[in-house]
Amino acid sequence: MANRIKKGDQVVINTGKDKGKQGEVLRVDGDRVIVSNANLIKRHTKPNPQAGVAGGVVEREASIHISNVNIVNPATGKGERVGFKVLEDGRKLRVFRSSGEALDA
């Protein structure tokens, strides 16, 4: 089944500590997404002079389940559900369920 959310989409987070935050999808990995500046975690890294990595505490984004985000509708500015519409030539088109507007051109 095709994903309703793709890399580069603007999304809003529905649940959790970052509820209400908006960001861009950086990566989709199965049923999980990584959203820019959301669900930040700290990782302790060892210094590695060969790779040019300085040690210390590094803050980065962790993944969020795809069911906990909605795509932002540019017309309303709110997160809305997305469905699919099959065209006559067999292509699938992502559409907002509330208005039926096409998400992809």
UniProtKB/Swiss-Prot annotation:
Oligomeric and partner information: Part of the 50S ribosomal subunit.
Keyword match Glycoprotein: no
Cited function: One of two assembly initiator proteins, it binds directly to the 5'-end of the 23S rRNA, where it nucleates assembly of the 50S subunit. One of the proteins that surrounds the polypeptide exit tunnel on the outside of the subunit.
Keyword vocabulary terms for this entry: Ribonucleoprotein, Ribosomal protein, RNA-binding, rRNA-binding
Source organism of the structure: Xanthomonas oryzae pv. oryzae (strain PXO99A)
Pfam families, alphabetized: KOW, ribosomal_L24
Gene name of the record: rplX
Full protein name: Large ribosomal subunit protein uL24
Signal peptide region: none
Similarity annotation: Belongs to the universal ribosomal protein uL24 family.
InterPro entries on file: KOW, Rib_uL2_dom2, Ribosomal_uL24, Ribosomal_uL24_KOW, Translation_prot_SH3-like_sf
Gene Ontology, cellular component aspect: ribonucleoprotein complex; ribosome
Top-level taxon in the UniProt lineage: Bacteria
MF terms (GO), sorted A to Z: rRNA binding; structural constituent of ribosome
Any GO BP: translation
Statement: the UniProt record of this protein carries the keyword RNA-binding: yes
